Amino acid sequence: MPSKKRAGNKKKGSQSNFAKLSIFQPNKYKFKKTCPLSAKGAPEVDYKNIRLLKKYMSENGKILPSRITNVSQKKQRELSLSIKRARNLALI
């Protein structure tokens, strides 16, 4: 079969499409996200503090990842441990 040539398949202008997109340009500003549980006056992570634990759980009862909640790695481990303890004691 003979191949068909598509119209409009040629590049228009000297710049490629990738150069025009802003997502491929480096980010000028980098903001550091602070952990909400490491700040001064932050509540202590405890398996009895159910109101705090429910903030870091989905509606289905799964533990939310730290990339969504902005929690540090150390506090994420404490959170997951206390959520699991609260589940075992049927507090959640």
Swiss-Prot record:
<dbReference type="GO" id="GO:0070181">
    <property type="term" value="F:small ribosomal subunit rRNA binding"/>
</dbReference>
<comment type="subunit">
    <text>Part of the 30S ribosomal subunit. Forms a tight heterodimer with protein bS6.</text>
</comment>
<comment type="function">
    <text>Binds as a heterodimer with protein bS6 to the central domain of the 16S rRNA, where it helps stabilize the platform of the 30S subunit.</text>
</comment>
<dbReference type="GO" id="GO:0022627">
    <property type="term" value="C:cytosolic small ribosomal subunit"/>
</dbReference>
<dbReference type="GO" id="GO:0006412">
    <property type="term" value="P:translation"/>
</dbReference>
<keyword id="KW-0699">rRNA-binding</keyword>
<dbReference type="GO" id="GO:0003735">
    <property type="term" value="F:structural constituent of ribosome"/>
</dbReference>
<keyword id="KW-0687">Ribonucleoprotein</keyword>
<keyword id="KW-0689">Ribosomal protein</keyword>
<keyword id="KW-0694">RNA-binding</keyword>
<dbReference type="InterPro" id="IPR001648">
    <property type="entry name" value="Ribosomal_bS18"/>
</dbReference>
<protein>
    <recommendedName>
        <fullName>Small ribosomal subunit protein bS18</fullName>
    </recommendedName>
</protein>
<comment type="similarity">
    <text>Belongs to the bacterial ribosomal protein bS18 family.</text>
</comment>
<dbReference type="InterPro" id="IPR036870">
    <property type="entry name" value="Ribosomal_bS18_sf"/>
</dbReference>
<dbReference type="Pfam" id="PF01084">
    <property type="entry name" value="Ribosomal_S18"/>
</dbReference>
<dbReference type="InterPro" id="IPR018275">
    <property type="entry name" value="Ribosomal_bS18_CS"/>
</dbReference>
